[in-house]
């Protein structure tokens, strides 16, 4: 499984952490299951969690699947204005915040991603993060057995 550094909007972090946001939506994304270090931008500028993301799914396919349900199809269409894919958030593990500025001082080649970067291409950075992260003990694993129309394109 590949590892990425994923930029994430602070406003969505609480619902992700609570397990309410079970899909991540992006315009571009890799086509495989990944482990992601979650980076929150300004003002925090910290890596705060590790999450597992499932293989991408086309929102276009969801639109086909739910075309007979107007409310759901409208939500999907709205999300499609900004995104192309949805990925299941498989699990979430909170870590003690890691200041990105300190990481960049150690590894000046590390740039803050607009969306995401593959950390596998920066093995020294990945090793440092893996060796220096400290889990807080808070973690969740999302259950997708009862996912349905009410969970599609809501957060």
Predicted segments, located by residue:
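Binuclear metal-dependent hydrolase catalytic cores
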Residues: 51
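Short acidic, glycine-rich loop/turn motifs
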Residues: 40-42
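Contiguous surface segments at macromolecular interaction interfaces
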Residues: 1-29, 45-48, 56-155
């Amino acid at each position: 499984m590949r590892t990425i550094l994923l930029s994430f909007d602070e406003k969505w972090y609480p619902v992700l952490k609570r397990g309410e946001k079970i899909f991540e939506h992006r315009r571009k994304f890799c086509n495989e299951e990944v482990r992601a270090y979650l980076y929150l931008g300004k003002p925090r500028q910290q890596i705060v969690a590790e999450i597992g993301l499932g293989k991408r799914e086309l929102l276009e396919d969801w639109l086909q699947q739910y075309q007979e349900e107007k409310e759901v199809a409208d939500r999907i269409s709205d999300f499609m204005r900004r995104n192309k894919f949805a990925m299941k958030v498989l699990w979430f593990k909170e870590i003690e915040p890691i200041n990105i500025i300190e990481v960049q001082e150690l590894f000046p080649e590390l740039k803050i991603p607009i969306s995401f970067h593959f950390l596998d291409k920066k093995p020294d950075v990945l090793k440092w993060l893996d060796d220096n992260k400290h889990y807080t003990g808070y973690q969740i694993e999302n259950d997708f057995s009862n996912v349905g129309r009410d969970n599609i394109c809501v957060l």
